[in-house]
Structure formats: C-alpha cells, structure tokens
Amino acid sequence: ADIDQEAADKSAKEHNVKVQTDDELMANKEIDLILNLTPPSSHKDIIVKSLMSEKHCFSEKPLAMNFEEALEIEKLSKEKGLKVGCAPDTFLGAAGQKSRELLENNSIGKIVLGTFNLMSHGMEDWHPNPDFFFKPGAGPVLDVGVYYITQLVNLLGPIKLINSVSSTAQEERTITSQPRYGEKIKVETPTTFIGSLEFYNDAKIQFFCSWDVWKHKHTTIELYGLEGSMIVPDPNFFSGNILMSKKNEDWQTISNDKMLLGIPNKDDNGSMFANYRGIGLADMI
C-alpha cells in the first residue's frame, strides 16, 4: 500500500504482489504490524491510523513532525497497549555495540567531551526526487543527524540540554541528478545546524550538521575521556573500524566485521558492507 495509490499499483505490478488501499490495509485482520516508509509529513497520520486499527507500527524517521506530535503518539500507544518503533536502528549494529562495550569497560575513562560532524552538500546531487529533504520534517538533523544522536544516546545515555542555532544558505536548490536535472527546489527548512548536547552523565558534545558544505576533513563521532580518545565509525552504517587511543599512545584499530550485525552482507559496486536495515523492526516484535 502507498499514500500514492498509483505508486502502489506500479510497485505491485513490478514485484507481482497484492496491492491494497490504505483503508484496506488497516482493515485487514491478518496484518498486525505496519511498516511506515512514507514521507515525514505523513508519519504521524499513518502511525495513528495503525494504532486505531489495533496494529503495531514501525516507522521511518522522524517519528513525527514535532515533539508534541510524538507525545500524542506515545500516549495513544500506551492507551492501546501497542508498540511503536522508529528508525534509525543502525546503533544495534556491531560498531555501535562494540563502541558501547569499550566505554562500559572504561577503556578511555569517563567521557568529558566529544564532537559529531555531518556535513555534505545535500541530496539534490544524487536523489531522483529530493524535494522532501528540504521540507519541514526533514533537513540534515531529522534526516541524517538522528543517526548520530541516536548512536550518542546509545553510548552516553539520555540528553539533558540542547543548544543550537540554524541557518538556510539558499532559498532554492537546483537538482543535478536524473531524471529531473535542472529543476528548482524551494528550501523550506534550515540546512545548517551548529550546537551542543549536554548529557546527564555530564558529557558535552559539539556538533555540526549541514548540507551547505562541499568538502571537509572532520571525522564522524569523536569521544574524549579522562584516559584516552575514541573515534566511532559512521553511525549510518552497522559496522566500521573503531579507533581508540590510550592517553598519548598511537591509535589502535578495533574491527567488528566478524561480530553479529557486522558481517558484510551487501555488495555495493564490488565493495561489501554490513546492511541489516530492518533489525529494529525484528527486535520490536
């Protein structure tokens, strides 16, 4: 099913599967869980429809367009006694779990400071239909930054305080990917965020989240403890080498590609990597 029935019909024909309208899907008693992969502006509506139809729901991120909507979903979920889950689930991968194990074993001591950096020039250079990335409910934080924040919560616990400023560098963007090369996109959400996260364990993390950067040399996540430093691999993926240094020693490479949810299983132009998208849904049920 799809909120765009034409798209649902086309996909069903391509893959030779049954197609249903949204209402038919929600009324189907044989289905007890909905996977919600709609654009961000539709997430809350589909989740609420699922819950009202007595079905669990696992959604693409973000959970909702704002905090108030997320609280409404939480309240309804509890009232119905049903589960709601949300991406990203990459923190369940080998890289996230190994990083957490190292921190729990006090490998670099108490975490005092850190950084995370997500910077590129946006989505219009490669995505065939990039419009929704620049609408409310998307942008660099809600689309990709959530991978970094989720990983940090996995590693450091809950966040106590957030400080941030934002900006929009361009009012319009030009698509340079096919098939819509040359079309203009109206930018309706900030494309740069700079700020800090303060965790309940007193760790302070500085962050840059931007789609206004052509090139940079920053790493993804760095954590600085009283006994050493750690570089956590890209949280958009399930595995990757961890770099760790004890005090003033050289960097040590810690691999996790032999661990559960770290074994390479997907080919990308001849290069294998670990891709276990959907593990969050499996874990929820």
Named regions from a protein language model:
Residues 3, 10, 15-76, 276-279:
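Beta-loop-alpha module in the N-terminal Rossmann-like domain of NAD(P)-dependent dehydrogenases
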Residues 71-89, 108-116:
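Rossmann-fold dehydrogenase core element
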Residues 21, 59, 65, 84-86, ...:
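Hydrophobic residues in well-ordered beta-strands that form the structural core
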Residues 8-9, 149:
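Short alpha-helix immediately C-terminal to the canonical SAM-binding loop
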Residues 17, 53-55, 80-82, 200-204:
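A short helix->loop->beta-strand "cap" motif at the edges of active sites that frequently abuts
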Residues 171, 175-188, 194, 199, ...:
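C-terminal glycine/acidic-rich active-site capping loop/insertion
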